[in-house]
Amino acid sequence: MFVTQDIVLRFFFSKKIIIKNGFSIPKNSSIILAPTHRSRWDGLVLTMAMGRRVSHKDCRFMVTKPEMRGIQGWFLKNLGCFSINQLSPSLSALRYAVDLIEKGEQLVVFPEGKINKYGKKLVLKEGL
């Protein structure tokens, strides 16, 4: 997580992210974030905006199984992602998500199920 949050993210976003009307998040509370998914940068920006330095918790992302392949998969795993099969969600993936919440962690779910560009109808996907 150090390389992702402290080096890669700061390189791309060091002077571009401004958090307005910041709020305090209790250290012992669970957090579920369900943002819209407009680009591949969403997870990185969210990590900067709501990650350990802000919420005292690492972001744990639920992503689709195909996203966890290759170099992208390695990067996502190191960012704190775990996969779920949208067509046939396994109990172990769901249990992992529940365990994160029970432990007071921060879970990020993109309810659209994929990147959805501006102007397109937002449709929630099954799989959770």
Residue ranges and their predicted role:
Residues 14-128:
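Soluble catalytic domains of membrane acyltransferases
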